[in-house]
Amino acid sequence: MAPLKMLALVILLLGASLQHIHAARGTNVGRECCLKYFKGAIPLRKLKTWYQTSEDCSRDAIVFVTVQNKAICSDPNDKKVKKALKYLQSLERS
């Protein structure tokens, strides 16, 4: 009987953890919401692209993607972020 109770507990915990993981995602085609902003320098020459998080996310953010496919969550009101956006937009035009 004890192994059956243990199995039920494991299934319950697994189900709860999967529900938590699913709830953290936004509706932006599988892209996740940002929980906090990156505070360091933004490496302009290593940036590949960017996107804005979904309106369903609790925190408005710009996400920069580097050439190594790493995501950098950034505050859209930060001067460094605006500079990085202008840099990427100038690359798109040329």
Curated annotation (Swiss-Prot):
GO molecular function: chemokine activity
PANTHER family: C-C MOTIF CHEMOKINE 17 (PTHR12015:SF111), SMALL INDUCIBLE CYTOKINE A (PTHR12015)
UniProt xrefs under SUPFAM superfamilies: Interleukin 8-like chemokines
PROSITE patterns linked: SMALL_CYTOKINES_CC (PS00472)
Encoding gene per record: CCL17
Subcellular location as annotated: Secreted
Recorded family membership: Belongs to the intercrine beta (chemokine CC) family.
Record-given protein name: C-C motif chemokine 17
Annotated S-S bridges: 33-57, 34-73
Physiological role: Chemokine, which displays chemotactic activity for T lymphocytes, preferentially Th2 cells, but not monocytes or granulocytes. Therefore plays an important role in a wide range of inflammatory and immunological processes. Acts by binding to CCR4 at T-cell surface. Mediates GM-CSF/CSF2-driven pain and inflammation. In the brain, required to maintain the typical, highly branched morphology of hippocampal microglia under homeostatic conditions.
Keyword check for Signal: yes
Keywords recorded for this protein, A-Z: Chemotaxis, Cytokine, Disulfide bond, Inflammatory response, Secreted, Signal
Coiled-coil features, chain-numbered ranges: none
Short name of any one Pfam family annotated for the protein: IL8
Cleavable signal peptide: 1-23
Principal place of residence: secreted
One cellular component (GO) term of this entry: extracellular space
Biological process (GO), any one: immune response
